[in-house]
Amino acid sequence: MKLSKTRTALGFSTGVCSVGAIITLMLANFGGEIHTSKQGLEIIGDAEGCRRDPYQCPADVLTVGIGSTAASGEKIDPKHRYSDLEIAERWKNDIVIAEQCVNKYGNGKQLPQSVFDAAVSITFNVGCGAVRNSTLFKQLRSGNYYQACHEYRKWVYAGGKKLPGLVSRREKEKALCLADLTSH
């Protein structure tokens, strides 16, 4: 009886997991493998949420953890309840894929940290194919960071509809993007 109460208190018997706990676990175990800051991870994690049990997202894609899909090459077992460590490792792999896109198509290695973090967040959300030839990434490649930061507000539509959740996420990404720039 005591064990089940402890497990419930720690979130093990529920399908929801703590984004903060996953970030802490990911940075402790895999921090050397990613360049995205804790602040960048918080924006992504808070926007995505965290679920232990696989589910079909609104786009009808099997998803688990913090927005993790099979797009990273790792299959999702729809009947498996994922542990915090499994979620942290999957998310690290997904973040690395988004970072590789930002590095390759957005001149990521030259970007200020906050600009890089915001670019990783939008890439994680919409995918590399959607952003790599975008005006946002063209501005990043040209070193026009301030202009790039103002591109985020254009990325608020899904299925032709303006979504409040995307408006909120893009405002947070824009603010993060501008954080390390001296002249706003």
Q: What is the predicted function of each stretch?
A:
Residues 44, 115-123, 151-153:
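Short alpha-helical scaffolding segments that buttress acidic/His motifs in well-ordered protein cores
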